[in-house]
Amino acid sequence: MRRRNFLLVIFPLLLSFLAQSASASELRTWDQLQGTSPKGYVLLFRHAYAPGVGDPENFRLNDCSTQRSLSDLGRQDARDVGEWLKRRQIDILRVESSRWCRAKETAELLGLGRVKLNKNLDSLFEENDIANHPQTFQIRKQIVAHRKNSGLLIMVGHYVNIAALTGVGLASGEGVLVRANRNGELRVLGATPALGR
């Protein structure tokens, strides 16, 4: 009984310690990039919080009124992450976004420069075999090609797309930092902080 009680106490503490260690490691990567023009780094960022799942039945790409929209909290989260990145003083090569309105608005609210739309970042929520989808292939190819470029490339997209590329499941308004190695494999190097979310 004593052993069981000990485990009930120590296990949550261990999980907390491991989470803090992982978070500290991820932030160290950002510390190393501070004030630089990093070569080959890409931030895959999930759009900020937009209540709901998937897309409404009447979804139309060019009509934001038919799509899920960011909540006020989601908009503030996007601004906060943008300010956090600005304080890092990392050179931004470009900000790209899915054509979905919630992704575009997130990218714009980051406030890190003009947003370029990239159809290969569009949501694959309704698709099968996302890992082998042509859009996933094209984004992976773009990240590999970015190895030769300086400046952080920011790509704002969707949960399923990013998970297919990295194996990481992101909450709304979170991002994962990746870089391709010489073999074209994507390495996960860090993540954006929760910033109180």
What are these regions (language model features)?
Residues 25-119, 124-127, 168-196:
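Active-site-proximal alpha-helix that buttresses catalytic centers in soluble enzyme cores
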Residues 18-24:
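Sec/Tat signal peptide C-region and signal peptidase I cleavage site
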Residues 9-17:
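Bacterial N-terminal signal peptides
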Residues 3-7:
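N-terminal export leaders
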Residues 137-147:
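A short, acidic, amphipathic alpha-helical segment used as a generic capping/interface helix at domain edges
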Residues 129-137:
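Short, surface-exposed amphipathic charged segments that create phosphate/polyanion-binding patches used
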Residues 40-42, 151-157:
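Generic beta-sheet signal
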